[in-house]
Amino acid sequence: MKKLLLSVSLLACLACFNACSTDVDLYADYKDIPVVYGLLDASQDTNYIRINRAFSSNNDHPINANEVALIADSCNYPGKLRAYIVEYQSGFGNQFTETGDVLELDTMTVHDKEEGIFYSPNQKVYYAKGKAVFSNNSPSRRYKYRLFIHKGNDTITAETGLVGDDDFKVITSQLNFKAAESSKSNQINFVETPNAVFYDMEFVFHYWESVNNGPLTQKQVSYSFGAKSIEELDKDGNVFSVSYGENTLFNLLKDAIGADTIVNPNHPNVVRYFDPKPVTIYLAAGGDELYNYIQVNAQTGYSQTIPDYTNISGGYGVFSSRRNLTKEVGISARTQTDLYGKPWGFKQQ
């Protein structure tokens, strides 16, 4: 799955924060603050939640957040906290009651974490097997999920609805581009999904490249539409649309290949191919809490200060829901002809 789909660098705030205020008292020296990040996805067998700790500081007792983030014992609570997710469903009078299903969170160690802000390559995460519970949901009911984390005498809670159903899909099966200058646009259409307040889409064009009769190397160019609220999207019935310019693919390839011709010493004997369905569309739907979190951090940027938005009671972070899907699609005959006509070395296989 593409990293940028709803990733929004959620882990970027798992660090130690300067003193400020909302619902948690941050003025005690070196007080640990629960920081929680979790996105429920009903289509996945396993859902992961990060439960870490940050430390407040003040000017008299400063903390270097970057140094602490690299120390596993500083970011993690000792042992395993009692954590679980309780399912609720709507009933008479729009009241929500417990269904009896509880997702117990266990811990596991991820061993392939790349180097970055936080300690690596081994990181502790919490997880739950929830697909069996989610698949029993009735389409005529609404559901919400409440997270409970017990830390000593404190209980941290958060709540979210569940985004998505099996009708969520991309309808478009082919993209249409042209090489000639054009101000026109085309659309990618997809079916809306319950509880989503925004969608994030990207398409990736994959191709193969061989230099001097060497081995084929996979290349790609991508275009991101960015996170769009449902109010920003065109809609017809239950179908949303996003628009892309007809020249988009050719502009991307021109930037990637670096010239309008391959007949020069830097590109000898370059041959390129593409598959019958060379474009992958990545689409994600996200819940209200995640959208609010993205919007706030887009305005303030990431820093060592506590973000203005959190839906974690007794801590910080975000607990929300998303649904990701991918679809491989073709490109029109005109697009193929225009690609073969450019001096970029594209050939039919």
Question: How would you name each of these model-derived features?
Answer:
Residues M1-L4, S21-T22:
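Positively charged n-region of N-terminal signal peptides that target proteins for export
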Residues S21-Q349:
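A sequence/structural signal for flexible, mid-protein segments enriched
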Residues L4-L5, V221:
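Residue-level detector of intrinsically disordered/flexible regions characterized by low predicted structural confidence
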Residues L5-A12:
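Sec-dependent signal peptide hydrophobic core
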Residues C16-A19:
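C-terminal motif of bacterial Sec signal peptides marking the signal peptidase cleavage site
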